[in-house]
């Protein structure tokens, strides 16, 4: 098993921001939104009117905006530590004509104890591997969540060899700009395994959440926050 090599926590370099803002991640972004819908359907649940949907590590706001489109009766908040990413996301919001009451972006650093209205959904995509201490994310969930909050966190998972990293880079980013190729390789080195994430969740009192390997390179954490204080192993309370 390869050892983890952390990478910088914040992507605020102008070249990185421009590259990620210009890249087409529409397929993976849409997958996150569809997974949220599937998890709701599986639990016969729905978001109430004016529910708060929270996207942690939102970057240029791709998934945040998709959440606002999919659930227009909800209030969506994207948080990121990089002010340049937030600026890009908010510029896109204004260009789309979406009011800040429905979609808002703010700069914030983990861990968080509150972000205004408690969240009925907390998602992140490719945030976990940036954190030098993963408990910065997991310790934030309960304070941010409403009494019944759905969570979905999707990230890369660390391969078991350098050869596997080479294969994934060749398969998925061979034609991408050099900055994205560099970052993708670094992110694979910095990501966690399924077993590591399970241990992190146990430490955070979130051991009832589901952790799955997905496709050839992802892992996914999903479930409902409510019930975790009692240690119940449930898909929804």
State where each predicted segment sits:
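Conserved beta-strand signature within the Rossmann-like core of class I S-adenosyl-L-methionine
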Residues: 148-155
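A conserved beta-strand element that flanks and buttresses the S-adenosyl-L-methionine
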Residues: 123
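Conserved class I S-adenosyl-L-methionine
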Residues: 49-59
């Amino acid at each position: 098993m390869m050892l983890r090599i952390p990478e910088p926590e914040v992507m605020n370099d102008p070249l990185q921001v421009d590259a990620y803002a210009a890249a087409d991640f529409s397929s993976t972004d849409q997958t996150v939104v569809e997974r949220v819908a599937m998890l709701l359907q599986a639990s016969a649940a729905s978001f109430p009117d004016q529910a708060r949907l929270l996207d942690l590590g939102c970057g240029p706001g791709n998934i945040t905006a998709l959440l606002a489109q999919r659930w227009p009766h909800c209030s969506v908040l994207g948080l990121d530590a990089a002010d340049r990413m937030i600026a890009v996301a908010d510029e896109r919001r204004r260009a789309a004509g979406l009011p800040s009451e429905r979609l808002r972006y703010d700069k914030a650093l983990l861990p968080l104890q509150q972000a205004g209205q408690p969240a009925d959904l907390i998602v992140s995509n490719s945030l976990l591997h940036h954190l030098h201490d993963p408990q910065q994310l997991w310790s934030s969930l309960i304070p941010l969540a409403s009494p019944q909050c759905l969570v979905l966190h999707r990230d890369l998972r660390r391969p078991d060899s350098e050869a596997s990293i080479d294969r994934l880079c060749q398969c998925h980013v061979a034609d991408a700009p050099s900055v994205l190729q560099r970052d993708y390789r670094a992110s694979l080195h910095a990501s966690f395994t399924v077993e590591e994430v399970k241990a992190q969740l146990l430490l955070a009192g979130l051991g009832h959440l589901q952790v799955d390997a997905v496709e050839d390179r992802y892992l996914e954490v999903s479930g409902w926050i409510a019930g975790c204080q009692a240690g119940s192993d449930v898909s929804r309370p």
